[in-house]
Each structure stands twice: as structure tokens, then as C-alpha cells.
Amino acid sequence: MAGSLNKVILIGNVGRDPEIRTTGEGKKIINLSLATTETWKDRITSERKERTEWHRVVIFSEGLVSIVERYVTKGSKLYIEGSLQTRKWNDNSGQEKYTTEVVLQNFNSQLILLDNKNSNNHTQGSGHNEYKYPEIKNHSFDHSDLDDEIPF
């Protein structure tokens, strides 16, 4: 295979207020848990079923850290894009432990607030940038120059 892709996209709700830590170099890191819920109807009983999956999310990107600090609280609905990483460490008894996390740390990461509890517009951050969605204007489109023929 010539290349590969490690990309995770999630839409869910924050399970508790984000945890903000500071490294020895003064860089802020945010840990949060994001719940995604899948629902379906049982074929036999016609009962509605639900399953919630909890995802560990770690944010290193300075721009996204500042957005989360200001706007994200328990219950916030988020759209996130990041990469999947598994960490390994030894606990106090010397046993190996593993955890898999969705990591947002570079310009390929994205976070969008999907509820507007704290602002009038949805705030989006990507890498070190933060901006509001621009207003979308309706534009008319002239269909007169399109052929009626199918191009294949």
C-alpha cells in the first residue's frame, strides 16, 4: 500500500467538564470524554435499543485548547476530527497498561461546537486557527448554458 490514513471523526456529547493540565514547559493539554450513542429498533421485540460508547479525547493544539477552555462544558455537543493513538505505560505494580485515545494535535485536527449555549455562532477551530462561520448568501445560478446530454 502506497499510503495510509489515520483519521477519526466523532459527533457526541462531552461527559464531564474538560480536564486542563499544564506540562513542565507551560503548554496546556486538555483531556475530555466524548459519548457517542447509537440507537436501533430490535427486530423481534420492536423495542428501541441504545448503546453508548465513551471515547477518550486529548487535545494538544493551542488553538483548540483555547476554544475548549472558553466554550466547552459537560453536555456540550462536539464534532471532532483527530487521529487514533494507543499509549502504553507501566503502572505502579509494573504491569503494562494500554489506552487508546483520539488525539487532536496538528493542522489536520478539527473541533466544531454544535450547540450554541455560549455563543450566537458555531465556533470552529482547526490547528492554531479559530474563526466563526461566515454568513452564506444565496446566489442565483444560470442553467441556460448546460447541455441536456449525458457526459458518458
Swiss-Prot record:
The keyword Repeat belongs to this UniProt entry's keyword annotation: no
Residue ranges of the annotated DNA-binding region, renumbered to this chain: 54-60
Residue numbers covered by motif Important for interaction with partner proteins: 147-152
Basic and acidic residues: bias regions: 129-144
Gene3D superfamilies found in the cross-reference section: Nucleic acid-binding proteins
UniProt record, GO biological process: DNA recombination; DNA repair; DNA replication
Gene Ontology CC terms: nucleoid
Chain segments carrying region Disordered: 117-152
PROSITE patterns: SSB
Family annotation (SUPFAM superfamilies): Nucleic acid-binding proteins (SSF50249)
Composition skew (Polar residues), residue ranges: 117-127
GO molecular function: single-stranded DNA binding
Domain SSB: 5-111
Domain of life: Bacteria
Keywords: DNA damage, DNA recombination, DNA repair, DNA replication, DNA-binding
InterPro entries membership: NA-bd_OB-fold, Primosome_PriB/ssb, ssDNA-bd
Role this protein plays: Plays an important role in DNA replication, recombination and repair. Binds to ssDNA and to an array of partner proteins to recruit them to their sites of action during DNA metabolism.
NCBIfam families, alphabetized: PRK06642.1, ssb
Subunit text: Homotetramer.
The name this protein goes by in its record: Single-stranded DNA-binding protein
Organism: Rickettsia typhi (strain ATCC VR-144 / Wilmington)
Organism taxonomic ancestry: Bacteria, Pseudomonadati, Pseudomonadota, Alphaproteobacteria, Rickettsiales
